[in-house]
Amino acid sequence: MQTCLRAARRIRHLVPFVAWLLAGTPALAADCTPRDLPPYDAAGKGGWAHVPLSKLKRDTKYAPAKEDGRSILKATAEDAASAFVHLEPSDPAKRPFLEWSWRVPALVEKADNRDPKKEDSPARLIVGFDGDKTTLTDAEQRRLSLAKKASGRDAPFATLMYIWSNRDPVGTVIPSAHSERLKMIVVESGAGGVGAWRNYRRNLAEDYRLAFGAAPGPMLGVAVMTDTDNTNAKAEGHYGPVRLACPAPAGK
């Protein structure tokens, strides 16, 4: 029984920040058109929403701001973890590219994403995907069932988490210690880019295949998260606008 309760608590930590979960299969656009996600100050207006992870954890503080004429989000975590989430149904086969930027003033000194006791990051961008959960292992289905009972929400079929790592090389895929259906991909490593805005363009379909060995199902939503609840440290993360983009036209 204690083992089941510990498993429920571990997976419950992952469920709330994927509050993008939808009933049934999301409606998808027939053709590819770029999609700029709403500005961060659209929270509560069909835009972004703050999602706590647990009543036992402090919340990361998220504050929309303006910098260089654009909408950004400033996240401040002090022994804290929570997320800023936006529901966004999309088909990675038709609109495969995810573009965003972020800036961190400093790394989380003791963070190590391979160690569940030190698994923090100054910047994360998280993407949830739908899929057929009956194909998952019995153990994973039990974890998801426990998570639903604990949180009142379904968990996504799979989750990609783009992170800034202290030491793992860019391109490294790190399995989560909490769930086989969550994989972290390192897109920035070390202190070389600290203090500067860093820009990213990731192919969701390719990254999903790299992490899970299959084509992705529909995208359910996106979240950003700065967390320090495991290292009890303080960190900041500044997030620029998020965009879903199309492949370049043939010949360009």
Residues covered by each model-derived region:
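Secreted extracellular polysaccharide-interacting domains
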Residues: 75-95, 106-110, 179-188
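Bacterial N-terminal signal peptides
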Residues: 12-25
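Short carbohydrate-recognition loop motifs
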Residues: 60-82
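Extracellular carbohydrate-recognition regions
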Residues: 29-55, 138-143
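Extracellular/luminal beta-rich ligand-recognition
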Residues: 120, 124, 130-178
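Extracellular beta-strand ligand-recognition surfaces/modules
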Residues: 122-125, 180-190, 194-232
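Extracellular beta-strand elements of beta-rich domains used
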Residues: 222, 242-244
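N-terminal secretory signal peptides that target proteins for export/translocation
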Residues: 1-11
